[in-house]
């Protein structure tokens, strides 16, 4: 185990390196910032001063002190340094999950000062909120402020002193916009040097990944926060059985399927038996090899990895072992060591049960790249009241399409795919079975796209229903506008409320009783045939059945008849979809019917 991974706490336990996740919107500079930290660390120390892990970079305290200059004195810290999770493929922070929340102990949310908060910034905030992970904001790209005078690798205050009033004023405007956006999301925030209590306020650190300005401050704040608020949580049992989380399941030439994991407690050895969360059942297997990247100084050697005998937390490590094909990214990994294997299986299964997504009898199919992502999507769908019938880690396969195609409601014949591929066979089957596929790498956009689709379907369904349903209309026979008395009666009418349509049955109220007087055969306006007439319009109506002067009179108020079943649907399901004048006609029609039968249309 490398010296930099832990520091002795003096009682058999040790303080491990805090795990730092870097997250933010695409192109806001997450990878550049990590590269800058890594590059500066290599320059500041000797070759090998930083340790390159699998999927992570360890920066020891001495190197941080060297980088931060007067800002950090090693004597003030017990923690051994910082371990930056470095997984560009895992741009969803929700990947990094462990017992009870996030795998990362602390996070950096990178926000471009020019763009402010963007979709993935908000998504990251939601996940930070849900997992209660402490974080700071790196306001990146300060070197792009108009008129900026770069001072490579300098702390913020020193570089600000070298700026014109105009450049500093412009930067302040951008920074306060970011602080305002955080406030809108329920976070109290300020420039980090003004924050007294980091538990209650978010510190904003202006940085440039391009020039290194502000990076000393970033490392200082991370070390300070970790030392002050996370020290107790960093206490681990050095020799105890290792506990970690799978970052990625990967094919590796010469080793077969391997696991990239982050170990956050205990130690893993090259001869350990491990238990890993699997897609179908829990996997028990023996470690064949523990692999770390070659040191930076030897990166040109032919071998990409070197084998090690043991690794202690916190570390990123690759495990080669048999039977790992079904392992899941985001799943727990535990070393068995001298405990009964059943006990460890039970622990892993209990942890997986915490992540299980609630599914319903009817709903949509969800596929995601990791367990953490699956959990985050399920939370977003639950909030949007969208039911899930099946939720799994992995690419979209034909069997997922088969499940989606059996949904009772058309809106549930859908698969939501987060950050995974759709297999060719599945795509073909989706077309054949008319299953809608949604793929995105921003959770809220995925949910929004599906929501829009459901709205489209529901609107189309309502239009179909409205087309088939008889709707109420109140109209009056105009005086002195009888063009023909019978067979059929042709009279001038005025529509009082609702829409008058051809082929409607016509009724007239006699006291409390409706009396059917005939059927509306045709409508004309200025000699032209029309299909309907709206409120306020006067048209000629041909009514088959009545004789003017007997069943109907000039000045009579007549109604388009509405069957009881249709009236019920209109009142209970479609009241929001029909125009105000039609709603008025419906209410009057229901009042008349309910005078003789209070339960009519209910």
UniProtKB/Swiss-Prot annotation:
The tr-type G domain, residue ranges: 15-230
One Pfam family linked to the record: GTP_EFTU_D2
Region of interest (G4), ranges: 140-143
Region feature (G1): 24-31
Chain segments carrying region G5: 208-210
Keyword entries, A-Z: GTP-binding, Initiation factor, Nucleotide-binding, Protein biosynthesis
Region of interest: G3: 86-89
Annotated region described as G2, given as residue ranges: 49-53
Any GO MF annotation of the entry: GTPase activity
Binding residues for GTP: 24-31, 86-90, 140-143
InterPro entries linked: EFTu-like_2, EFTU-type, P-loop_NTPase, Small_GTP-bd, T_Tr_GTP-bd_dom, TF_aIF-2_arc, TIF_IF2, TIF_IF2_dom3
GO cellular component, as recorded: cytoplasm
Protein's job: Function in general translation initiation by promoting the binding of the formylmethionine-tRNA to ribosomes. Seems to function along with eIF-2.
Family listed: Belongs to the TRAFAC class translation factor GTPase superfamily. Classic translation factor GTPase family. IF-2 subfamily.
Name of the protein this chain belongs to: Probable translation initiation factor IF-2
Source taxonomy: Archaea, Methanobacteriati, Methanobacteriota, Stenosarchaea group, Halobacteria
């Amino acid at each position: 185990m490398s010296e930099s991974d832990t520091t002795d706490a003096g009682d058999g336990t040790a303080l491990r390196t805090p795990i730092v996740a870097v997250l933010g919107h695409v192109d806001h500079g997450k990878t550049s910032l990590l590269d800058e930290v890594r590059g500066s660390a290599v320059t500041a120390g000797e070759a090998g001063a930083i340790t390159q892990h699998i999927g992570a970079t360890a920066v020891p305290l001495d190197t941080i002190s060297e980088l931060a200059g007067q800002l950090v004195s090693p004597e003030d810290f017990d923690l051994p340094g910082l371990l930056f999770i470095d997984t560009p493929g895992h741009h969803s922070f929700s990947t990094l999950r462990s017992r009870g929340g996030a795998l990362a102990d602390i996070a950096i949310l990178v926000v471009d000062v020019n763009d402010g908060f963007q979709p993935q910034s908000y998504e990251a905030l939601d996940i930070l909120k849900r997992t209660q992970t402490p974080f700071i904001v790196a306001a990146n790209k300060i070197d792009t402020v108009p008129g900026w005078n770069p001072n490579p690798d300098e702390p913020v205050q020193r570089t600000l002193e070298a700026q014109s009033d105009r450049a500093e004023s412009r930067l302040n405007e951008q920074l306060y916009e970011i602080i305002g956006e955080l406030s809108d999301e329920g976070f109290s925030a300020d420039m980090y040097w003004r924050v007294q209590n980091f538990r209650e306020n978010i510190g904003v650190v202006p940085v440039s990944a391009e020039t290194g300005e502000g990076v000393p401050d970033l490392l200082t704040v991370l070390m300070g926060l970790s030392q002050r608020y996370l020290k107790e949580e960093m206490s681990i049992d050095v020799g105890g059985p290792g506990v970690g989380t799978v970052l990625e399941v990967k094919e590796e030439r010469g080793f077969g399927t391997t696991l990239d994991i982050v170990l956050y407690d205990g130690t893993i050895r090259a001869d350990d038996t491990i238990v890993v969360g699997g897609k179908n059942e829990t996997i028990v297997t023996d470690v064949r090899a523990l692999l770390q990247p070659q040191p930076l100084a030897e990166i040109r050697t032919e071998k990409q990895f070197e084998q090690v005998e043991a690794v202690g937390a916190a570390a990123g490590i690759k495990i080669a072992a048999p039977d790992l094909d079904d392992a899941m990214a985001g799943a727990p990994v535990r070393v068995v060591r001298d405990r009964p294997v059943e006990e460890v299986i039970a622990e892993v299964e209990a942890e997986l049960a915490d992540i299980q997504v609630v599914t319903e009898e009817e709903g949509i199919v969800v596929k995601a790249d990791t367990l953490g992502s699956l959990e985050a999507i399920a939370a977003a769908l639950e909030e949007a009241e969208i039911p899930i019938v099946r939720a799994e880690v992995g690419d979209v396969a034909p069997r997922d399409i088969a499940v989606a195609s059996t949904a009772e409601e058309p809106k549930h014949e859908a698969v939501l795919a987060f950050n995974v591929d759709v297999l060719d066979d599945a795509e073909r089957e989706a077309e054949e079975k008319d299953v809608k596929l949604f793929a995105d790498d921003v959770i809220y956009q995925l949910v929004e796209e599906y929501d829009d689709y459901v709205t489209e379907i529901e609107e189309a369904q309502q239009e179909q229903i409205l087309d088939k349903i008889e709707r109420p209309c109140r109209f009056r026979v105009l005086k002195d506008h009888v063009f023909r008395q019978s067979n059929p009666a042709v009279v001038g009418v005025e529509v009082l409320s609702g829409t008058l349509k051809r082929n409607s049955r016509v009724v007239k109220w006699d006291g409390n009783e409706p009396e059917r007087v005939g059927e509306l055969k045709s409508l004309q306006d200025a000699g032209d045939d029309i299909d309907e007439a709206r409120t306020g319009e006067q048209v000629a109506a041909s009514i088959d059945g009545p004789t003017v002067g007997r069943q109907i009179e000039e000045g009579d108020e007549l109604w388009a008849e509405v069957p009881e079943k249709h009236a019920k649907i209109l009142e209970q399901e479609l009241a929001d979809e029909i125009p105000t004048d039609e709603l008025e006609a419906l209410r009057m029609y229901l009042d008349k019917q309910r005078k003789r039968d209070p339960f009519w249309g209910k």
